[in-house]
Curated annotation (Swiss-Prot):
It is found in: Cytoplasm. Belongs to the type III pantothenate kinase family. Catalyzes the phosphorylation of pantothenate (Pan), the first step in CoA biosynthesis. It comes from Magnetococcus marinus (strain ATCC BAA-1437 / JCM 17883 / MC-1). K(+) binds at residue 129. Homodimer. This is Type III pantothenate kinase. Pathway: Cofactor biosynthesis; coenzyme A biosynthesis; CoA from (R)-pantothenate: step 1/5. It catalyses: (R)-pantothenate + ATP = (R)-4'-phosphopantothenate + ADP + H(+).
Length: 255
């Protein structure tokens, strides 16, 4: 079995593959203060709850945008599983030509998503990943990674609105029934949601025009992908496990 780990600023998503099939997945909070032992115990408990024999895991791959957490997980895997972790980095075989000056300048999660989406559609594509930041990545018709854009995440924008104002309350984010809010909370929810749908569609449309590609498939992933996709004119599909799929593909290309 293959254990894949995607470390983001807010969450860590773990997946366990049997061959090409995702057998189990978990989402846990990213906590920079946790030690390798704490992550090791947490991992052991997750496996035990699914009645997974840890001795059946023979490979581990990790992509992390939070270096201290990535390092703690590497130590946890070494101590509790007796395995060395393949860490996504600049020296890997991505199977994608890179047009940027150096792959080290691109977040590991973004390259992993690019690998997964091109394997999926085999032509020009845009990946929109809704996380603490929302990333937009363009892959060309020949699988060339062309770059992208980074915007503040929707929850990050919500937090900033609450923290930087004196009277606006903290609100729960869900699909608003109307654009014209009748209360302060409704108005905030409407502005954040519909404003963000406009941001997403606007960036995608500009990337389409700037790239000149006639046919671009747009895949969304990340925690808020389904929420925004329901009103987006540009998102073609939502793939919650896109990053995990990319990690599996990278492991297979680099083992």
């Amino acid at each position: 079995m293959l254990l894949v780990m995607d470390v983001g600023n807010t969450n860590i998503v773990l997946g366990l593959y049997e061959g090409d099939q995702l057998a189990h997945s978990w989402r846990i909070a990213s906590r920079i203060e946790r030690t390798g032992d704490e992550y090791g115990i947490l991992l052991a408990n997750l496996l035990q709850l699914k009645q997974v024999d840890a001795h059946g895991i023979n490979g581990v791959i990790l992509a992390s945008v939070v270096p201290p957490i990535g390092s703690a997980l590497v130590r946890a895997v070494r101590r509790y599983l007796g395995l060395e972790t393949l860490v996504v980095g600049a020296s890997m075989k991505y199977g994608l030509p890179l047009s940027e000056e150096s792959p080290s300048g691109v977040g590991a999660d973004r390259l992993v998503n690019a690998v997964a989406v091109f394997d999926k559609v085999a032509h020009a594509a845009i990946v929109v990943d809704f996380g603490t930041a929302t990333t937009f990545d363009l892959i060309g018709e020949q699988g060339i990674y062309l770059g992208g854009a980074i915007a503040p995440g929707l929850n990050s924008s919500l937090d900033a609105l609450f923290e930087k104002t004196a009277k606006l309350p903290r609100i729960e984010l869900f699909h608003p029934e109307r654009v014209i809010g009748k209360t302060t909370e409704e108005a905030m929810r409407s502005g954040l949601y519909w404003g963000y749908v406009g941001l997403v569609d606007g960036i995608i449309e500009r990337m389409r025009v700037e790239s000149g590609f006639a046919n671009i498939h747009v895949t969304a992933t990340g925690g808020l992908a389904k929420l925004i996709a329901r009103d987006s004119r540009c998102i073609d599909d939502v793939d919650d496990m896109l990053t995990l799929t990319g990690l599996r593909l990278l492991y297979q290309r680099n083992r």
